[in-house]
Design a protein with these regions (language model features):
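Short, basic/glycine-rich phosphate-binding loops at helix/coil junctions
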Residues: 34, 92-94, 138
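DPxDG-like acidic metal-binding loop motif
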Residues: 71-102, 107
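Oxyanion-binding and handling regions
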Residues: 1-19, 23, 106-228
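N-terminal beta-alpha supersecondary unit
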Residues: 1-74
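Generic recognition of short, well-ordered alpha-helical segments
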Residues: 50, 85-89, 178
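Buried hydrophobic packing segments
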Residues: 55, 90-94, 111-115
Length: 228
């Protein structure tokens, strides 16, 4: 029986989850695993140094051991330097033995998966924008497979040009007056990036290759900001 571990330290606090491994894009599980098995710990106030403790608690609650984990998916950002550095290094450490494979994915690409779960539309991710706060009046945007760091004006212009059907947003984007008005006026369904199981990211195992070497995306915003 094998399981997947999901680790997200790119947003507020720490989110960590374990789910029955899915062996293919269709979602079947190997070794007679319960496909519905899923446990998570979401601690918005947690800091990086508690990640090991959180994993121990999660494994205990799940009734499994680290040896049962065969694949690990960690978000690579964009996000905070300290959070990403801790999360990526932690996952590299527990994969170093070669007993499990490490997959790194863009946080925005991972969040994009939430649209498909909410709409029951397998094509949803191709019609989805992801908008999360970078800093005041600037956002991380994923649209049509491209990721960028944009002002509110640029985000609105890109959304207007591409007209997505869905938008995965964080609380700040949800509450932004200009973005909210645009979504409402253009009939774009918004999906909050909270409260969704991380196992919805399982489809990304099929898209990405495992590697012990992962580079977190915590420097990119600095390059963009130099131009503003």
């Amino acid at each position: 029986m094998s399981f997947d571990l999901y680790v997200d330290t790119s947003r507020k606090g720490i989110s960590i989850a374990v789910a029955a491994a899915r062996s293919n894009a269709a979602g079947s599980t190997p070794d007679g695993c319960d496909e519905a098995f899923y446990k998570e710990i979401v601690d918005p106030e947690a800091r990086g140094e508690t990640l090991s403790k959180n994993l121990d608690c999660l494994l205990e609650q799940s009734g499994i051991s680290l040896q049962d984990i065969k694949r690990i998916m960690v978000t690579l950002g964009p996000g905070s330097f300290s959070g990403l550095r801790t999360g990526v290094a932690f996952c590299q450490g527990i994969c170093f033995s070669g007993m499990r494979k490490l997959y790194g994915v863009s946080t925005l690409e991972a969040l994009e998966c939430f649209a498909e779960s909410q709409t029951a539309d397998s094509a949803a991710t191709t019609q989805t924008a992801v908008v999360v706060k970078a800093r005041k009046d600037y956002w991380y945007l994923r649209l049509c497979g491209q990721e960028s760091f944009d002002s509110t004006e640029d985000v609105l212009a890109k959304l207007s040009a591409n007209q997505p059907k869905f938008a995965v947003v964080d609380a700040t984007a949800r509450d932004d007056v200009r973005l909210t008005e645009f979504f409402s006026t253009n009939g774009i369904k918004t999906i909050l990036d909270e409260g969704n199981p991380l196992s919805l990211w399982a489809k990304l195992f099929e898209k990405h290759q495992p590697s012990l070497i992962q580079e977190a995306n915590y420097i990119q915003p600095s390059y963009f900001e130099k131009g503003h």
